[in-house]
From Swiss-Prot:
Active site: 77, 216
Tissue: Tuber.
Chain span(s) of sequence motif DGA/G: 216-218
Superkingdom in the source lineage: Eukaryota
Protein name: Patatin-11
Species for this entry: Solanum tuberosum (Potato)
Family: Belongs to the patatin family.
Length: 387
């Protein structure tokens, strides 16, 4: 009798724990973030294609899209473009691009975007006209409020000297942020040196004109928007009743996938003090951009991984990054066929690499694990909504 009672108590405890685990999973906030990096966006473009393919298999749904699974999708520069592609609705209110369309987009349009050189020593390297043209064709008149999930796309206003973050959740307080997606995408991609800044206007709640003078979102996030995306997700969790159980900064109920565009920081291009002492302003400007992006990517990953580990939630954060780019693959604007093929190889090879030196798990295996969590969570939410 005592044994039977003990078994029943044990079963009850297991069921209670399982129920709690599923409840936690159902209320988990999911975040996808993609770095900036120009044509190197091909590298992270490989990752969403793999992940979306896994979700389609698990849910037996060829129409499954990443926007169906992530609460917040954010990016800067080329990552902002990727964000818009998978969250902007078509005429059927589905993402106008599947994840498998990302890499072909770069192959089709990259050579034209990075080909219209101004030929001027002073001024941007490219005129940006083709980039704006293709963004207008693809995104139409769609505005932020129409995005299929919460977005977080960064830019920097050189007139006000402040970052500008385009999100759906900010529109009630700041309706002037409800800009057209093509204006936002050009702005977040308008990297100093490469493209001209972008000027456009919207309107405030009282109808007054609101002016933007924007450059690349990497100026605001220094290339890695993961912290920004995580901040937007935290605010969403605090304001949305669906996530009422989540406390501020409770990373146990956050799932973050952060995609990098690759870095050569370990360390293809290094310098000595003797070499750098001979540099002029232009050489320093180019080197500082490279160093700053590499350092920011490392420090952002270090901070986020430390916080998740401190909360015993390290499996809820996955940073997918290639740290050993070399040759032409390090260039943001080499859109030659040969280099783009190399970038595809980098992305495909990355899937087979271990996540870290301390873990045998490959990125491919980690993404399958994330796909299972995303799939289960979506089903739990659907079941909860049906009651």
């Amino acid at each position: 009798m005592a044994t039977t009672k003990s078994v029943l108590v044990l079963i009850f405890m297991i069921l209670a724990t399982t129920s709690s685990t599923f409840a936690t999973l159902g209320e988990m906030v999911t975040v996808l973030s993609t770095d900036g990096g120009g044509i190197k966006g091909i590298i992270p473009g490989i990752i969403p294609e793999f992940l979306e393919g896994q979700l389609q298999k698990m849910d037996n749904n060829a129409d499954a899209r990443l926007a169906d699974y992530f609460d917040v999708i954010g990016g800067t520069s080329t990552g902002g473009l990727l964000t818009a592609m998978i969250t902007t609705p078509n005429e059927n209110n589905r993402p106008f691009a599947a994840a498998k369309d990302i890499v072909p987009f770069y192959f089709q349009h990259g050579p034209h975007i990075f080909n219209s050189s101004t030929g001027q020593f002073f001024g941007p390297k490219y005129d940006g006209k083709y980039l704006m043209q293709v963004l207008q064709e693809k995104l139409g008149e769609t505005r932020v409020h129409q995005a299929l999930t919460e977005v977080a796309i960064s830019s920097f206003d050189i007139k006000t000297n402040k970052p500008v973050i385009f999100t759906k959740s900010n529109l009630a307080k700041s309706p002037e942020l409800d800009a057209k997606m093509y204006d936002i995408c050009y702005s977040t991609a308008a990297a100093p040196i490469y493209f001209p800044p972008h000027h456009f206007v919207t309107h405030t709640s009282n109808g007054a004109t609101y002016e933007f003078n924007l450059v690349d979102g990497g100026v605001a996030t220094v290339g890695d928007p993961a912290l920004l995306s995580l901040s937007v997700a935290t605010r969403l969790a605090q304001e949305d009743p669906a996530f009422s159980s989540i406390k501020s900064l409770d990373y146990k109920q956050m799932l973050l996938l952060s995609l990098g565009t690759g870095t050569n920081s370990e360390f293809d291009k290094t310098y000595t003090a003797e070499e750098a002492a001979k540099w002029g302003p232009l050489r320093w400007m180019l080197a500082i951009q490279q160093m700053t992006n590499a350092a920011s990517s490392y420090m952002t990953d270090y901070y986020i991984s430390t916080v998740f580990q401190a909360r015993h939630s390290q499996n809820n954060y996955l940073r997918v990054q290639e740290n050993a780019l070399n040759g032409t693959t390090t260039e943001m604007d080499d859109a030659s066929e040969a280099n783009m093929e190399l970038l595809v190889q980098v992305g495909e090879t990355l899937l087979k690499k271990p996540v870290s030196k301390d873990s045998p798990e490959t990125y491919e295996e980690a993404l399958k694990r994330f796909a299972k969590l995303l799939s289960d969570r979506k089903k739990l939410r659907a079941n909860k909504a049906s009651y």
